[in-house]
Curated annotation (Swiss-Prot):
NAD(+) binds at K148. It is a peripheral membrane protein. This is Sterol-4-alpha-carboxylate 3-dehydrogenase erg26, decarboxylating. Sterol-4-alpha-carboxylate 3-dehydrogenase; part of the third module of ergosterol biosynthesis pathway that includes by the late steps of the pathway. The third module or late pathway involves the ergosterol synthesis itself through consecutive reactions that mainly occur in the endoplasmic reticulum (ER) membrane. In Aspergillus, the biosynthesis pathway of the sterol precursors leading to the prevalent sterol ergosterol differs from yeast. The ringsystem of lanosterol in S.cerevisiae is firstly demethylised in three enzymatic steps leading to the intermediate zymosterol and secondly a methyl group is added to zymosterol by the sterol 24-C-methyltransferase to form fecosterol. In Aspergillus, lanosterol is firstly transmethylated by the sterol 24-C-methyltransferase leading to the intermediate eburicol and secondly demethylated in three steps to form fecosterol. Keywords: Endoplasmic reticulum, Lipid biosynthesis, Lipid metabolism, Membrane, NAD, Oxidoreductase, Steroid biosynthesis, Steroid metabolism, Sterol biosynthesis, Sterol metabolism. Heterotetramer of erg25, erg26, erg27 and erg28. Erg28 acts as a scaffold to tether erg27 and other 4,4-demethylation-related enzymes, forming a demethylation enzyme complex, in the endoplasmic reticulum. PANTHER family: BIFUNCTIONAL POLYMYXIN RESISTANCE PROTEIN ARNA (PTHR43245), SHORT CHAIN DEHYDROGENASE_REDUCTASE FAMILY 42E, MEMBER 2 (PTHR43245:SF51). Its EC number is 1.1.1.170.
């Protein structure tokens, strides 16, 4: 079996950046597995990796790829986006991850790196510089983070001498390829809603530039393959290491786009919760997924920042792109996308 073969599950936002960084290294066989071919990434990287398609909720699809490619390392980034039906998260994040673990064990994979979420420890209360000792709540705020917590648990419990595993809890990803965070903030600008603010904007938040998150996955892989795999069975918070007030990040995005709100109308958190509750009830009766929820209010009003000392010590992780430069690169990419 080739010694340096890496299979990336998911070729989207994070997976694509991991593949790009892997392609910068020498002596690697690289493959990606996704529901559909990422033709844009294949074209960009000129065939430097192999693309497999299939459904990770189907064990046969997974095993077919493992049998053909023989990965030494698997980096599992695949996950549905936010605001989908509950069943989808459990099918993909929980059942799909279980399928990947089984295939890793069956085909003698050496290392599995899993993309978890910093949100797995969030229950609506403030998270102030918390580290990996923070307990996972018994009751989660949403199905996405509940399913990610269960998948993370499976991955860590699968760690052994033969299959080394690690999970990375990434926080607030943004960057080129982002289809959620920054585009969502720019849609607020487009809709003329920048003057509205939930909460007092005294809550500190962690965001993570995508290239830093990708880099952390490669560091975890390197550690697990080393003669001293200190990351085995471990979980790590990954951020930019630069906290910022929640609404300041949004306003930095808007400022880079040439807009400064002329004034601010503040809605206290209790008012936001009341409005979100009403919106959820209306959508319940209309059988629609609500866009404005109590979870979003709590998310945007709470302190949510994390201590990355463990990642620095064990993985030797240090962000390679700072927050301001990350915002600049993201908006430059979005400008380029508009022209095509």
């Amino acid at each position: 079996m080739p010694m340096n073969s890496v299979l990336v599950i998911g070729s989207g936002f994070l997976g694509g950046h991991i593949i790009r960084q892997l392609c910068e290294r020498e002596n690697l066989r690289i493959a990606a597995f996704d529901l559909f071919e990422n033709e844009k990434l294949l074209h960009e990287l000129h065939g430097q990796f192999t693309m497999y398609t299939g459904d990770l909720t189907k064990q046969g699809d997974i095993e077919r790829v493992f049998e053909e490619f023989h990965p030494r390392v698997v980096i599992h980034t695949a996950s549905p986006v936010h605001n989908l039906a509950r069943d989808i998260y459990f099918e993909v994040n929980v059942d799909g991850t279980a399928n990947i673990i089984k295939a890793c064990q069956k085909f003698n994979v050496d290392a599995l790196v899993y993309t978890s979420s910093a949100g797995v420890v969030f229950n609506g209360a403030d998270l102030i510089n918390v580290d990996e000792s923070q307990p996972i709540p018994e009751v989660h705020m949403d199905a996405y983070n509940e399913s990610k917590a269960l998948a993370e648990k499976q991955v860590l419990e699968a760690s052994s001498e033969s299959l080394k595993t690690a999970a990375l809890r990434v926080a607030g990803l943004f960057g080129p390829g982002d289809r959620q965070l920054v585009p969502g903030m720019l849609s607020v600008l487009k809709n003329g809603q920048t003057k509205f603010q939930l909460g007092d904007n005294l809550n500190l938040f962690d965001f993570t530039y995508i290239e830093n998150a990708a880099y952390a996955h490669l560091l975890a892989m390197d550690n697990l393959l080393s003669s001293n795999p200190t990351a085995n069975g471990q979980v790590f918070f990954i951020t930019n290491g630069q906290v910022i007030y929640f609404w300041d990040f949004a306003r930095a995005i808007w400022a880079h786009a040439g807009h400064v709100p002329p004034y601010i109308i503040k809605f206290p958190r209790p008012v936001g919760m009341l409005l979100a509750t009403a919106a959820e009830w209306v959508c319940y009766f209309l059988k629609k997924e609500p866009g404005f929820t109590r979870f979003r209010v709590q998310f945007s009003c709470a302190n949510r920042y994390f201590n990355i000392q463990k990642a620095e010590d064990v993985l030797k992780y240090h962000p390679i792109v700072d927050l301001e430069e990350g915002i600049r690169r993201t908006l430059a990419w979005m400008d380029t996308e508009k022209k095509h």
